[in-house]
Amino acid sequence: MNIERADFVDRVKIFVKAGDGGNGCVSFRREKYVPKGGPDGGDGGNGGFVFLRANPSVSTLIEFVNKRKFMAENGKHGMGKKMKGRNGKDLFIDVPVGTVVKDAVTGEVIADLNEPGKIVCVARGGRGGRGNAHFATSIKQAPLIAERGEKGESRWLELELKILADVGLVGYPNVGKSSLISRISNARPKIANYPFTTLIPNLGVVKYDDFSFVVADIPGLIEGASEGVGLGNVFLRHVERCYLIAHVIDVSGYEREDPVRDYFVIREEMKKYSPFLLEKPEIVVANKIDLIGKEELEKILKRLRDATNREVIPVSAVTGEGIDLLVSKLASIVREMKVEKPERKEEKFVKPSPVWRRLPEKFHLEVVKEDEGYWVVEGENLRVWIERFDLNQRDARLMLLQVLEKNGLNNKLKEAGVKEGDVVRIGDFEFEYRE
């Protein structure tokens, strides 16, 4: 799996907005030869939800560079004859397997889409408003009231791709990681004799007998990468999911003078990125052994083994010497670790309920003077009522005023200094105050 640098994007921000619920309908049945009429306003449809779905056929987040806003469909309004409005269509957004979804404002991790087909809801649609058929009572048989649909949820998300690989190749630039992955797998990365030839991670599938595993070639690290030197250390996020780290060292002495120092410099950069990486199983791959004498090689290998306390496998990515042993060792470790990993039970996806806020019955009201003789009634719980109902509807207005009066609206108006004839606004509705 080779991806061109221009197409490789592993971190983006997107905006998602679920659909609003449709409004309920105010309607009355008036049909010839139908003896019983009455309210028959239908409910509004629910707004569409927004889901993210892990799709194996998507490899990068490039699609989100030019399109960053995604909106699901609104629910349709209710109609007469108790006809419910159609629900808005849900929106499914495909992302690469291995995408971590975060709330862009809080940084909270919402989901880790680390398995093909895994789905997460990132914005719930609003529930449709109820039509006036729901508000008929024995006392009020012809209600002029219906609910507005709830607003759908919206949020900014940060999507971060962490490639799924079993083995991660790390090391200085130009130590032969790309040559190595092309030798052991089906990957065909760009290979050249200069630093930072590899600018993006390359993935390759390695086959060993009846077993196969994925290796990732991570762009080279250098001292100071955690401070942004070179390509920085951001690509180390793609090692976080690996079972095993293969630390590639150039032991030829031509470009890198001290392989032991190189090893610890890279380890320090890994630690600065995430101490968790140092806890992963690791083997050291001593590359370019074809460019050094046997006696000198043995001294270097001993130094590496003593200093790192790791298994060191000498190889030549050019001649192929030691490659079979390396592949055998990688396959053995990965196979063992996959067996040890408990099998994850498949989670059944359950669509959540649409957004629907209960109508509060208690209010903390504030009366604010905006101008001479002009007042505004405010309150957190009051906002739910204002958004739910059209206060130009007589019965909606009367119902709200009754609830407000129970919460001491009249006393609040007097305490604030509202006089007879002053204008009071609640939401979009204005009325003249009378004692």
Swiss-Prot record:
Cysteines engaged in disulfide bonds, as pairs: none
Entry binding sites for GTP: 171-178, 196-200, 217-220, 287-290, 316-318
Function statement: An essential GTPase which binds GTP, GDP and possibly (p)ppGpp with moderate affinity, with high nucleotide exchange rates and a fairly low GTP hydrolysis rate. Plays a role in control of the cell cycle, stress response, ribosome biogenesis and in those bacteria that undergo differentiation, in morphogenesis control.
Pfam family, one: MMR_HSR1
GO MF terms, alphabetically ordered: GTP binding; GTPase activity; magnesium ion binding
Broad EC category: hydrolase
Keywords for the protein's UniProt record, in alphabetical order: Cytoplasm, GTP-binding, Hydrolase, Magnesium, Metal-binding, Nucleotide-binding
Chloroplast among keywords: no
Keyword set includes Zinc: no
NCBIfam families attached to this UniProt entry: Obg_CgtA, Obg_CgtA_exten, PRK12296.1, PRK12297.1, PRK12299.1, small_GTP
The protein's name: GTPase Obg
Cofactor(s) in the UniProt record: Mg(2+)
